[in-house]
């Protein structure tokens, strides 16, 4: 077990005893914080922010200095990897990412690089080094990547459109070519995440944002299969320390039992899933992350406290729960409500850990 002043995130991910439920928030460093906006202005654009270690590390540390969070997460974007593979991507304010030349043929796929993280993604690794030094073993650092399926959705479609008709047509018209692309992305992710681990991250999350648009059969073949391959090839134990892995498939609550067989340590839920149901599905063998609706943070303190207590009570007693939102925090969320949520989770969860049946 890795040593930190506050190791509750790692302990919960591994279903070990804790004194209170840990919390971190998806996009915890983001536009809702004026401090983030200030740092963002120092970069030419979002991509430049991600590629400047001094700035990206500062961005990652903003919420850690502002709130009593139990884990930090690197500041980057899932589409940094396709960019390193040779694709041109732009991030437009309020419109999202866009690829200038989306993949449209097998030759496009063959022309993609499998990037060497030490060369093509060094700015991410350098940011990790800076963050780890600043954290000074106070709390763990989370690294991440998008899932192969989710990255392929953007790379083929060119932008987010919620339907992703081009890649879904490929399933039925050019499945061999699609699997070729997914394998190349998978190999790139394995190298990327293992480099993150070498440089100091203590846990990994795979964000499968668009896995939920598939049928169960296609999800298992085109998304879950490749995430399982990633997990099997990660340095899940590095320098004697277990590196817990989380899978987050948005709108994938119906596949919890299948995800639990992937080799992951934690399943992250969106807000559409009942957390009590999810815990029963994994039978205490996998930790659960989640799963407050981000819109709850627009409510009053009393309503936030009520919903927090509801989620904690539904999960119930003992460890294995990491509190978080069911997706990323919204840009106009009141920071004082975020602080209240964190304090509420810490205070209200203590009673659920007094008699812990898991190993210490």
Curated annotation (Swiss-Prot):
The protein's enzyme class: lyase
Pfam families: URO-D (PF01208)
Localisation: Cytoplasm
Biological processes annotated in GO: protoporphyrinogen IX biosynthetic process from glutamate
Stated name of the protein: Uroporphyrinogen decarboxylase
Family classification: Belongs to the uroporphyrinogen decarboxylase family.
Quaternary context: Homodimer.
Function, as annotated: Catalyzes the decarboxylation of four acetate groups of uroporphyrinogen-III to yield coproporphyrinogen-III.
Catalytic activity: uroporphyrinogen III + 4 H(+) = coproporphyrinogen III + 4 CO2
InterPro entries per record: UROD/MetE-like_sf, Uroporphyrinogen_deCO2ase_HemE, Uroporphyrinogen_deCOase
Site (Transition state stabilizer): 77
Pathway: Porphyrin-containing compound metabolism; protoporphyrin-IX biosynthesis; coproporphyrinogen-III from 5-aminolevulinate: step 4/4
Main location as per UniProt: cytoplasm
Cystine bridges: none
Gene field: hemE
NCBIfam families: hemE
Residues bound to substrate: 27-31, 46, 77, 154, 209, 327
Tree of life domain: Bacteria
Single GO molecular function: uroporphyrinogen decarboxylase activity
GO cellular component: cytosol
Keywords, ordered alphabetically: Cytoplasm, Decarboxylase, Lyase, Porphyrin biosynthesis
Species: Wigglesworthia glossinidia brevipalpis
Enzyme nomenclature, EC number: 4.1.1.37
């Amino acid at each position: 077990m890795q040593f930190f002043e506050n190791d509750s995130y790692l302990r919960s991910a591994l279903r070990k005893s804790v004194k209170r439920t840990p919390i971190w928030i998806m996009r915890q460093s983001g536009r809702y914080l004026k401090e983030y906006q200030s740092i963002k202005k120092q970069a030419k654009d979002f991509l430049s922010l991600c590629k400047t270690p001094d700035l990206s590390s500062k961005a990652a540390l903003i919420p850690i200095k502002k709130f009593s969070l139990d884990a930090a997460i690197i500041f980057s974007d899932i589409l940094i990897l396709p960019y390193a593979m040779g694709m041109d991507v732009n991030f437009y304010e309020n419109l999202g990412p866009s690829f200038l030349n989306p993949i449209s043929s097998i030759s496009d796929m063959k022309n993609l690089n499998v990037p060497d993280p030490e060369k093509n993604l060094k700015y991410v690794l350098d940011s990790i080094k800076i963050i780890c030094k600043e954290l000074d073993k106070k709390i763990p650092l989370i690294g991440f990547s998008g899932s192969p399926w989710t990255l392929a959705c953007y790379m083929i479609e060119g932008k987010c459109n919620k339907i992703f008709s081009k890649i879904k047509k490929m399933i039925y018209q050019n499945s061999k070519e699609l699997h070729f692309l997914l394998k190349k992305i998978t190999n790139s992710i394995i190298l990327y995440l293992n480099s993150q681990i070498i440089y100091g991250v203590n846990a990994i999350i795979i964000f499968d944002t668009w896995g939920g648009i598939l049928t169960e059969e296609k999800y298992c073949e085109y998304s879950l299969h490749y995430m399982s391959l990633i997990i099997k090839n990660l340095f899940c134990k590095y320098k004697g320390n277990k590196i817990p892995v989380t899978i987050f498939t948005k709108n994938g609550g119906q596949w919890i039992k299948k995800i639990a067989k992937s080799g992951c340590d934690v399943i992250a839920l969106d807000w559409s899933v009942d957390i009590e149901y999810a815990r029963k599905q994994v039978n205490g063998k996998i930790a659960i992350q989640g799963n407050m609706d981000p819109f709850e943070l627009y409510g009053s303190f009393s309503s936030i406290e009520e919903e927090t207590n509801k989620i904690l009570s539904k999960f119930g007693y003992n460890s294995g729960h990491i509190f978080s939102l069911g997706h990323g925090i919204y840009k106009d969320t009141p920071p004082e409500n975020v602080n209240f949520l964190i304090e509420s989770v810490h205070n209200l969860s203590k009673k659920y850990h007094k008699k812990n049946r898991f190993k210490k």
